[in-house]
Amino acid sequence: MKSLLMGAASLTAMVSLAVETPPPLVTEKGARGDAKEVRRAFDQGEFAITCSVKFDALPSKGAVTGLIDITADKDGVVKVRVPKAKTSLDRDFICYSRAKVKKGEWHHLAFNFSRLRDRAALYLDGSLQYENDAKAIPLPGVGEPVVAKDFKGEVKDFKAWDIALESERILPSPDGKGSRWDVKHAARIAALKARLDANPKAKFGPVAVVTTDPTDQERVLDDGLPEKADFSGAVEVFAARDEFEDASVVVTALEPVKEFTLELSDLACGGAKIPAKDVDIRLVKRWFRSGGAWHTYFVDYRFRVLTPHLLVHDDDLIRVDELRTRNFLRFDYPDGRRWTDVSDPHKGIDWSFENMPFRDADTIQPIRSLAAYGRNQQYFLTFHAKKDAKPGLYTGSLKLVADGKTAGTMPVRFRILDFTLPPRGSSYDDPSIMYQGHVNNQASFCRGRTQKEREACAKAMIRTMKEHNQLDFNGMWGNRDKAALAKEVGMIPDSMHIGNSIDRWQNLFPDKKYDELTSDDLKLAMRYTERKNRNWFDYYNTEYPDADKYMLFYSESSAYQALHIWQEEQARLVREKMKNAKVYAHSMGVWNWYFAGDIQDGNVQTSLDRADADRWHALGEPIYPYAKPFAAPENPAAQRSHLGLSRWKFSHMDGNMQHGCLARVESWNEWSNSAGGDGNYRCQVMLYEQYGGFLETICWAGVREAYDDVRYLSLLKAKATAQLKAKSEPLMREARRALIWLENLNGADEGMQDVRIAAVRRIQILDQLARKEAR
């Protein structure tokens, strides 16, 4: 039986293998430091105890340790009791072993206790005996930090830490010469050395450097090289014009390095140049997330998973205690820096980033985390191929600076392709339907103490939305000031989803039953509704005369009354009074089609059923989901696949309505009860607030790549379709081959980057043949 938390081998992968186990606070020789301070450390509710014990009497007599009660009854069943704190209203924590000890024989005992994770586990001779499921973990009140007090028997190799260590660190290795963690650690180091010895190009003095696919689904942790690492010793990236593209670099210490950083040169292609300052270098910050991290948007509060997630310039902005599984944010006050724990489930967060001095550096800063062999750090380098960029191969170098000295340089090759991506992709079934990128349910994005700061923050948010192909989001178009800022950034909507909803007219007559309402009542209600909403009808008609304006009518409704009767007259009014007006609803299934297909101009739903897409496309209307996944999973591959190729080809959906983007304050602490909002959900987060702006994440990069995949594939389909009647037989046949290739994609099994590369090659061939025919 494996432990669900501390006993499972999988937990070891969730917590760092690279951090060595610290010295214990208590051994047979006594406590390290003042006894009161040691007791206070254990009373925080996080500790681990391991020892070998021989009971010379059953039932046992005396104390194995004064910290907690460890006894054995007359049958040899071990009992562990953790006394509750005097101020606690909980009961003492008690658990028992399933196996039995024998009098006069040596047995290995190990016990873990964690209030943070609400888990406790008991091991006997390396086997899990108990782990709590529903039993509450009290705030403890431990006793004296002594060993074998008046104990009838012997205790040796006693160790106690004020940390709830995972099982591998407190269980003995098969040879008894260390812990199971020691064995894994040695094997990891040996495997790392073997891989690097076989790939000497990746070695640069005190560090090794490899590259990876930035949207790969493998987590890059701090304890080894990724399985799909590229050891070529070069950074290579390509992008079409009007596209952002990332490169991923992983730096591993071959010897202790006190300080490390990357320095990029300018990139040149003939007379054209990309300044180094235009390439944003950020490190991937690993921190603890709740159970479900990386894979799902459902939460398990008792797990803590070390997860690559945030993109930051300053590693010290967030400190992570990898053994105690805690996250700390840095606040720069006038009188000095302070770090605040944002991972305690028993503490909420009641401050606002509008006023708190929490902000990342503007450029990449040196790191101090490569202090031991095998420790690594992942970096993202974000390149931008502008619309007017000269195509060609831009070359430069990436300098590796370790302890102030150049450890080596890597060649950097950035190829800008000779074509421009369309601003938006289009539906696989209907090129007239644009692939929708919409974000709803985000917090306010105009943070700042002054108007200038608030405007700068808003423009930064609008800019990142545009750069990540999210061209429509709540809270933007209905505000004249924000809309003006969007125009400054160059974000001009061709469609928008408006949160305003006209209430059903029947509510204006609360004293009448539905079957008592008359046509005169309806006319009166419509006149009232038109007057009530005239201002915003005029606003949208004036500000966005050419944009399609989708008005939301009800959310998650599936009854006939809500979907048809309540919407019919309101929809007629909206279409009469607003130019290019559209109506839609959040629905839970196919009933939207049956009940309101004649009213609505598309649908937003949870299902990814291809049949639903076929139905709405038969009317020439769009359909897109707002879930599967929600915004929570940190895995960029999941975001890239589900929001891009899989949506576009496998489900034939027309985009996404992302349910969540910018973190509310409590989202920094995923273990607080309110973090996920309604339902058993994790934080619906892609961006994190800081003073005057926000921090991006690798899953946000995955969203951008999802939409870029669709832009590439839509461009290929448009070019191929246009050449089906080409006079040149080679061009006509190549166009057919491209369309056959697109049709044969199922959107679920292919590697996304492989599809991207193949699409680029087919676009280039079509362009070459078209130019040849034009001559």
Predicted regions and their residues:
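Extended recognition patches within non-cytosolic domains
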Residues: 21-24, 28-29, 121-123, 154-190
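Extracellular glycan-recognition modules
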Residues: 32-89, 103, 118-119, 155, ...
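Short tryptophan-centered beta-strand motifs in secreted/extracellular beta-sheet-rich domains
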Residues: 106-113, 122
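Flexible glycan-contacting loops in extracellular carbohydrate-active proteins
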Residues: 129-160
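Beta-sheet-dominated interaction scaffolds and their linkers
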Residues: 197-254
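Aromatic-lined carbohydrate-binding surfaces of glycoside hydrolases
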Residues: 268, 287-289, 303-308, 313-371, ...
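Catalytic domains of carbohydrate-active enzymes that cleave complex glycans
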Residues: 525, 529, 533-562, 567, ...
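Catalytic-core region of carbohydrate-active enzymes that cleave or remodel glycosidic bonds
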Residues: 597-676
